[in-house]
Amino acid sequence: MAITAQMVKELREKTGAGMMDCKKALTETNGDMEKAIDFLREKGIAKAAKKADRIAAEGLTFIETNGNDGLILELNSETDFVAKNEGFQTLIKELAAHLLANKPANVEEAMAQTMENGKKVEEHINEAIAKIGEKLTLRRFEIVSKTDADAFGAYLHMGGRIGVLTVLEGSTDEAAAKDVAMHIAAVNPKYIDRDAVTAEEVEHERQVLTQQALNEGKPEKIVAKMVEGRLGKFFEEICLLDQAFVKNPDMKVRQFVESKGGTLKGFVRYAVGEGIEKREDNFAEEVMNQVKGSN
């Protein structure tokens, strides 16, 4: 398989490894991106890939709570400038209020619902598009619930570039729930605890760490012990309750939550545009297209 410059660029962004190392890794793995990441890690060249795609889309996240119901949503725009527009800000609040009150199962169902003004959600968004002059997209939302004995923690970072909604069970301490949400915004854990990590993911990591230790020339008899130690660090990186609490690194998040008399029921973290990559036009093609368009 031909290794392209774009593939090398993507691998560099995912791993931080050098260009020649990335090219070699892709060549050795026949262009398989995930295997190339493992190859670099086994050689000790790259750290564990965060697997978070480059964030390129614009827009905002927003959180709305009402009693025991909470909602987090993401509304995309084409530019950051429009996301700061008053009309955009009004639209996202109107959508949040509607979604929380009507609880559609998904975006498709939401778009077909009728708002208080008598218009379909899709029609309401299209009217905003006509006024603002940019494509706007209701990308996703999630509705969560709690009981009177629980607390929501809502946190918007950088005005909504990142949004986190937590549910602290068995405690009504909203400040504590928000502190956990702030930690999640900063550290971006994948799971609540180790029990949530699949056996397949743990085994894959164990294999990579084993090969890494062997490539370092460590004696086989101590490799297993080394791998278990490194697996502990792996869990700390991806599991919320195992992480050092951002506001007090001397304690784990688990200890902080327990000190408040509660347990963490769940969390949702949205970062604007994650998993969306803007199309990168070739500059020469762009110039050619402009020239052709002027004829």
Curated annotation (Swiss-Prot):
Residues 79-82 are annotated as: Involved in Mg(2+) ion dislocation from EF-Tu. The keyword Ribonucleoprotein does not apply. Keywords: Cytoplasm, Elongation factor, Protein biosynthesis. InterPro entries: EF-Ts_dimer_sf, Transl_elong_EFTs/EF1B, Transl_elong_EFTs/EF1B_dimer, Transl_elong_Ts_CS, UBA-like_sf. GO terms for cellular component: cytoplasm. Its main location: cytoplasm. It is found in: Cytoplasm. One of its GO terms (molecular function) is translation elongation factor activity. Signal peptide: none annotated. The keyword Cytoplasm applies. CDD domains: UBA_EF-Ts. Associates with the EF-Tu.GDP complex and induces the exchange of GDP to GTP. It remains bound to the aminoacyl-tRNA.EF-Tu.GTP complex up to the GTP hydrolysis stage on the ribosome. Belongs to the EF-Ts family. NCBIfam families: tsf. This is Elongation factor Ts. It comes from Bacillus anthracis. The lineage of its organism: Bacteria, Bacillati, Bacillota, Bacilli, Bacillales. The gene is tsf.
